[in-house]
Amino acid sequence: MEKYYKKEGRYSYYEAGEGTPIVVLHGLMGGLSNFDAVARYFSEKGYKIVIPDLPIYTQNILKTNVKAFAKYVKDFITFKGFDRVILLGNSLGGHIALYHTKMYPEKVAGLVLTGSSGLYESAMGDSYPKRGDYEYIKKKAQAVFYDPAMATKELVDEVYASVNDRMKLIKTLTIAKSAIRHNMAKDLPKMHVQTCLIWGKNDSVTPPNVAEEFNELLPNATLYWIDKCGHAAMMEHPDEFNRLLEDWLTHTHLKAH
């Protein structure tokens, strides 16, 4: 993915393909929301896939919250010169996508949420009481997936390093508090954007009842399930995820021309 990686001004981002822009928002731990397969597939199908690095650990602590990240995404979309985009978010990225849609509905042609936070906030994890215990962190990372083998050593190392970095831990807890403050339950019924929900039936972070609640509260939502799948559907079942997303894009007339 390196050759598609760009740094311009205050933004670092991955970009591939030409066409309808899909802006992808990752979760707290980038490695746990790996969109490689989605990026490869849709960049060859008439979409421009753009994945900005969100400043989760690099912004001032006062700007370490869902609302400030949503504003960052809006500024990035303006910087790129996009008129309207399809927003795709996983976990915290889904919450940021939702808040962005609430604040700037005119910028969002469609919304795709997978394992999104915004309604159910144990999604943010705890204060990692045993964060120095590598095996404990490994089990936490494995629990994100249906198949624990998805939590590679490289990925577990990334999570372990993050939770043992004091500043990152403080910011993670700050974001968790912000996510609870910015619960979306009251806002969702007013959000009429076409929304695609793709959920793992075995998601233990944002369980299936969360997807059902999103589906009930969002007026124009369509819910798709993936079996034997945890919190990161686009990583665990990329082909199925891509097929469902492509179907939805076709049915909602958001398909690239």
Residue ranges and their predicted role:
Residues 12-59:
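Conserved HGGG/HGGXW glycine-rich cap/lid loop of the alpha/beta-hydrolase fold
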Residues 89, 93, 97:
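Gly/Ala-rich beta-loop-alpha elbow adjacent to hydrolase catalytic centers
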Residues 98-103, 107-139:
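Flexible "cap/lid" loop of the alpha/beta hydrolase fold
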